[in-house]
Amino acid sequence: MIFTILVCFFAGMGAGIGTGFAGMSAAAVISPMLITFLGMDPYMAVGIALSSDVLASAVSAYTYGKNKNLDVKNGLIMMVSVLAFTVVGSYVSSLVPSTTMGNFSVFMTFLLGIKFIVKPVMTTKEAMEKVSPKKRAVQSLICGVMIGFICGFIGAGGGMMMLLILTSVLGYELKTAVGTSVFIMTFTAFTGAVSHFAIGGMPNIAVWILCIVFTLLWARIAAVFANKATPKTLNRTTGVILVVLGIVVMAFSILN
């Protein structure tokens, strides 16, 4: 039991810090750890990870929103298209072998981390506001469709995809990008978790609750810190966290 608690603690810690700082999906960290150390069925592990994502993302989104780092309007547009296509992607993924799914998102986490360290996102809120609302709405819709399908297919909350697209394609400032990403992820992860449990049955309750609690705790700590940090510090910290988590999770995949 102590071993299980420790696995859940570190899985929750990695996932929570990743969520609070970078809007990363808990699925990227929790799933591989539960599969590697507790020998859990991959589909169930993703279900637990997604449900851990829900509260962690919600508390992070609340923290970012309170600090005015959240674009609700375009977030909602993107969310609707993400949700619709997550279902499509999820169905397609149930027809594909499970190993191909996780590795892609982990590798992407690692590359994105390097990007933040080498080429930080230094966009300001003023620059963001120059884009016309109509153009931004259309961009949000199209990007949402792409993200949704890929999320559903890979079984990750798509935090990394959203962060990449919000900062690179839509030109968001980093804090607003993370805030908007965790806001959307609250809903995508909820939908994903419900559909996973509906298809795969209920998970191991102890592991499920432990992962949710630890992820929530660390996400709150990370989000509070991230909102106080300067853009430069935040870029570097986010980059380092993503690179470290990417390497750790890739190591688990190799162990497996």
Q: Across the structure, where does each feature detected by a protein language model lie?
A:
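Membrane-embedded alpha-helical segments of transport systems
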Residues: 51-59, 84-88, 92, 183-191
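Transmembrane helix-bundle signature of multi-pass membrane transporters/permeases
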Residues: 16, 46-54, 178-189, 242
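A small-residue-rich subset of transmembrane alpha-helices
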Residues: 52, 180-197, 206-219
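Juxtamembrane transmembrane-helix boundary motif
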Residues: 1-17, 31-37, 42, 63-149, ...
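Short, structured loop/turn "capping" segments at alpha-beta junctions
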Residues: 124-125, 156-161, 172-176
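Hydrophobic, membrane-facing alpha-helical anchors
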Residues: 1-4, 8, 51-62, 157-167, ...
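Membrane-interface alpha-helices at helix entry/exit sites of multi-pass transporters
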Residues: 40-48, 73-74, 171-182
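Transmembrane helix boundary and interhelical junction motifs in multipass membrane proteins
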Residues: 21-30, 155-165
